[in-house]
């Protein structure tokens, strides 16, 4: 864009405006490009599958590379240069994201299934099958698979079963399985377990007083941790309200106490919005105020009960309570609770090492125990009371992951988090035989399924073939013939399958090779939903890019090979057209490759190179400029417009 150097003398200027366009492609050619992107991502993720899966090294800017066997980490690290290939990869990344969000594990399984369904669907549609019928057949088969998984599922009842699930999800690491089994045993199946970096070579388990609830920060602007989107405070104050907070005056006293004590402040309320939230965010961003607003958990009467538990555990006064008439606007230091540590994410809040007031926590625990002793209580109320009692009495299990280096600790933490998520999923919906065997046991039921049309049957067959892939991939990563293993397992029954670690066929459940039902159900659902849509795609629309034009406009004609030797010769023709003369090269900028003088002069801007106090408006019109510019190779998509310099 060219701007006047003498605004008073020139009332208008011209700019080169890019006429942005879209690249629209049709048919099997663009589908093939997307499938190629799916293949690249799935190949990278699949190598991590099973107990003998390999590791992947991911480059990270400004820090050491990450070594991981976590399929989700690998999937989200991939971005392909080709736009259409990248679209395919991104769609499968969405599958991994959804599976990780819902089940916390199984992203590798979901990716392998998605690739199989997408490729087979693409092949069938290329041969003339109806895309809509194919998708219907796929989703019909998935419903049958989910029903059969539910029938096969067995509830997790013992510590040994929990330990087996954790060990398998941690790629066969028995130490991780033992640690998670012990932690679950101490805080209960639905207790809170968190993972942190350790300070020693060995892993450690600590049980500390604390509780966790399911709501997190109100705004991401409160995040202060470089490791994930979290808020982490030490030695923080806690302010609690049962009512909504909208005005700044409601929280001023609490903020003053926080500043006087030089301690972070956590505000828990039904909702925080308006002037109050704006002021907190603004002060956090501008002044570094250590504060975080959190929405209180649950709803209705249950919310009031949980707020009471938080108050008892931290020693905070509950403002807005019908029993307590204390005003938030008059909050004193003794009205604020205290915690030794707080970890807040977008979905959850964990308050550790609270400092309750004398006798109040014991009274709260006794009150819950008395309610549990009543015989006329409903089953769902009894479950809630047990969860609350566990949170107040058993505390929080903290797993400190040790190692000889940061890379080793991070790799192990990924596996521990996966194992924890798998354990929670198993407790929630039960377990089925592992190693891909549960999917193989669903195939005979799909083969017996009667459909209305041939294309619908093809959709069912696509799922039948895809269900073989998890077992086949695990076997291939173990160095054996995958299809042969699948055939042998299919000839067996129930939990008979292949143990990749021991390289033998056995009863998998007896050997502790099991998968959480929720993980498999989520994986097949997410994979089929996205992959079947991908294979039915007929048109792909992307942003059109003209690399030659971008190179010419940016003056990057000389490339970047020799330091920053950026030649602005690409703009010579434009400069000549506008009467500005040549701008020369940009050599000589220290050791950066040279940015030579901006010679060539600004030819019509005054004698001796100086700027004149006035400038002529004579010159080519916008229409003439358009014709001259479009005559330059690669500049056909550029348009010249007159714009008012007063708007600059």
From Swiss-Prot:
Q: Which domain of life is it from?
A: Eukaryota
Tell me where in or outside the cell this protein is found. Answer: Mitochondrion matrix
Instruction: List the signal peptide residues.
Output: none
GO annotation terms (biological process): apoptotic mitochondrial changes; mitochondrial unfolded protein response; protein folding; protein import into mitochondrial intermembrane space; protein refolding
Gene Ontology MF terms in the entry: ATP binding; ATP hydrolysis activity; ATP-dependent protein folding chaperone; protein-folding chaperone binding
Where does the record say the transit peptide is?
1-55
Q: Which GO terms describe its cellular component?
A: mitochondrial inner membrane; mitochondrial matrix
Kindly state which keywords UniProt assigns to this record, in alphabetical order: ATP-binding, Chaperone, Mitochondrion, Nucleotide-binding, Transit peptide
One short Pfam family name for this protein?
Answer: Cpn60_TCP1
Q: Which InterPro entries match?
A: Chaperonin_Cpn60_CS, Cpn60/GroEL, Cpn60/GroEL/TCP-1, GroEL-like_apical_dom_sf, GROEL-like_equatorial_sf, TCP-1-like_intermed_sf
Role played? Prevents misfolding and promotes the refolding and proper assembly of unfolded polypeptides generated under stress conditions.
Q: Which family does it belong to?
A: Belongs to the chaperonin (HSP60) family.
Protein name, per record: 60 kDa heat shock protein homolog 1, mitochondrial
- Lineage, uppermost ranks: Eukaryota, Metazoa, Ecdysozoa, Arthropoda, Hexapoda
* Gene name for this UniProt entry: Hsp60B
């Amino acid at each position: 864009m060219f701007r006047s150097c003498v605004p008073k003398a020139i009332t208008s200027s011209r700019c080169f405006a890019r006429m942005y366009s879209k690249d629209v492609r049709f048919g099997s050619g663009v589908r093939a490009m997307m499938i190629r992107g799916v293949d690249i991502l799935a190949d990278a993720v699949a190598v991590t599958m099973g107990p003998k899966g390999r590791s992947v090294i991911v480059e990270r800017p400004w820090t050491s590379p990450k070594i991981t066997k976590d399929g989700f980490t690998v999937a989200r690290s991939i971005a392909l240069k080709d736009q259409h290939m990248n679209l395919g990869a991104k769609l499968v990344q969405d599958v991994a994201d959804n599976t990780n969000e819902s089940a916390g594990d199984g992203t590798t399984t979901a990716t392998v299934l998605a690739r199989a369904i997408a490729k087979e669907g693409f092949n069938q549609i290329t041969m003339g099958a109806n895309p809509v019928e194919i998708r219907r057949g796929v989703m019909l088969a998935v419903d049958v698979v989910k029903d059969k998984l539910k029938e096969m599922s067995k509830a997790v009842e013992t510590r040994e079963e929990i330990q087996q699930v954790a060990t398998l999800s941690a790629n066969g690491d028995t130490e991780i399985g033992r640690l998670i089994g012990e932690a679950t045993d101490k805080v209960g199946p639905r207790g809170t377990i968190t993972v942190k970096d350790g300070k020693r070579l060995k892993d450690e388990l600590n049980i500390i007083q604390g509780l966790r609830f399911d709501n997190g920060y109100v705004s991401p602007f409160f995040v202060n941790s470089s490791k994930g989107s979290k808020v982490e405070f030490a030695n923080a104050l806690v302010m609690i309200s049962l009512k909504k907070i909208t005005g700044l005056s409601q929280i001023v006293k609490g903020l003053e106490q926080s500043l006087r004590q030089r301690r972070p402040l956590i505000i828990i309320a039904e909702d925080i919005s308006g002037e109050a939230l704006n002021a907190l965010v603004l002060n956090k961003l501008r002044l570094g105020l250590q504060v975080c607003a959190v929405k209180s958990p649950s709803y209705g009467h249950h919310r009031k009960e949980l707020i009471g538990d938080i108050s008892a555990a931290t020693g905070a006064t509950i403002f807005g309570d019908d029993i307590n008439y204390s005003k938030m606007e008059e909050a004193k230091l003794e009205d604020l609770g205290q915690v030794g540590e707080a970890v807040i994410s977008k979905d959850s809040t964990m308050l550790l090492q609270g400092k309750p007031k004398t006798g109040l926590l014991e009274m709260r625990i006794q009150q819950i125990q008395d309610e549990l002793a009543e015989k006329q209580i409903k089953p769902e109320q009894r479950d809630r009371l047990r969860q609350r009692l566990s949170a107040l009495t058993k505390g929080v299990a903290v797993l400190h992951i040790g190692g000889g280096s940061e890379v080793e600790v991070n790799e192990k933490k990924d596996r521990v988090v996966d194992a924890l998520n798998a354990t929670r999923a198993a407790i929630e919906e039960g377990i089925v035989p592992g190693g891909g065997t549960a999917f193989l046991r669903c195939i005979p039921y799909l083969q017996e399924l009667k459909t209305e049309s041939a294309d619908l049957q093809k959709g069912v067959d696509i799922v039948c073939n895809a269900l073989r892939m998890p077992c086949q991939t695990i076997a291939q990563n173990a160095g054996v013939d995958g299809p042969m293993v699948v055939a042998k397992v299919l000839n067996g029954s129930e939990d008979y399958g292949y143990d990749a670690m021991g390289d033998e066929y056995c009863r998998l459940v007896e050997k502790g090779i099991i998968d959480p039902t929720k993980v498999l159900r989520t994986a097949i659902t997410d994979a089929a939903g996205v992959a079947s849509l991908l294979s039915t795609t007929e048109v792909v629309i992307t942003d059109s890019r003209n690399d030659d034009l971008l190179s010419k406009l940016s003056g990057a004609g000389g490339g970047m090979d020799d330091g920053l030797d950026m030649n602005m010769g690409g703009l010579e023709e434009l400069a000549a057209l506008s009467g500005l003369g040549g701008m020369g090269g940009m050599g000589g900028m220290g050791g950066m490759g040279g940015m030579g003088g901006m010679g060539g002069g600004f030819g019509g801007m005054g004698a001796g190179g100086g700027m004149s106090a006035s400038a002529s408006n004579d010159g080519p019109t916008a229409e003439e400029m358009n014709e001259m510019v479009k005559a330059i190779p690669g500049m056909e998509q550029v348009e010249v417009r007159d714009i008012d310099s007063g708007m600059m």
